Amino acid sequence: MKLSLSSPPYADAPVVVLISGLGGSGSYWLPQLAVLEQEYQVVCYDQRGTGNNPDTLAEDYSIAQMAAELHQALVAAGIERYAVVGHALGALVGMQLALDYPASVTMLVSVNGWLRINAHTRRCFQVRERLLYSGGAQAWVEAQPLFLYPADWMAARAPRLEAEDALALAHFQGKNNLLRRLNALKRADFSHHADRIRRPVQIICASDDLLVPTACSSELHAALPDSQKMVMPYGGHACNVTDPETFNALLLNGLASLLHHREAAL
């Protein structure tokens, strides 16, 4: 699996791995790259079955498989220890990595994540699946911003959204791959295993997220033994895109306090 690695800013710089959500594209993290690359070696990638890692996914494709293939790719690239920043589905992959490869994962950041899918989130995906079946890729892509962004943010950026729609259609991961990745997301349940994650976790959520209620992050915080939660008042599900200044400040502070300080204590 192809990875994109930035140059380390200094010798033995900590590695931060960015994992996007259901869309699977590493470019989702573009608003974070410049600030992160000043202090960390940053890894981003298109998830298997998407973008520049095309493949046909098995019907029983799982979060555990997503974690395993990423870890194997990191080891092949010579990366043995890394922090994980995951958004939604990416946060699930991050928790799976922490469970399956605890010696490799230094810390986690969960952005609008959850322990197991909430009834409201499941309802949103049911609506989106019906759109996919009835209207195809175009209907899926055109509806997607409604679940990602605040209304006023979208209204002020109509040309940008049109360009994003065109790009998403051109690089659509395919109906079968999308549904198999979505099913993996829906099956994932960390409610009985989260207490085994012994790495520090920063939880970031947005209070106006239409897709994932903030209660999901509260449940994560209660279940994870070593976690801290930050709530952004604005930004929607893709809060790292819509309010990168606020998000980046939270992320950098979290990485500095949880990663550097914990490693210094080892």
Curated annotation (Swiss-Prot):
SUPFAM superfamilies: alpha/beta-Hydrolases (SSF53474)
GO molecular function, one term: hydrolase activity, acting on carbon-nitrogen (but not peptide) bonds, in linear amides
GO cellular component: a single term: membrane
EC number: 3.5.1.-
Catalytic activity line of the entry: carbamate + 2 H(+) = NH4(+) + CO2
Residue ranges annotated for the AB hydrolase-1 domain, each copy included: 14-115
UniProt keyword annotations, A-Z: Hydrolase
BP GO annotations: nitrogen utilization; uracil catabolic process
Its job: Involved in pyrimidine catabolism. May facilitate the hydrolysis of carbamate, a reaction that can also occur spontaneously.
Family: Belongs to the AB hydrolase superfamily. Hydrolase RutD family.
Record-given protein name: Putative carbamate hydrolase RutD
Species: Shigella flexneri serotype 5b (strain 8401)
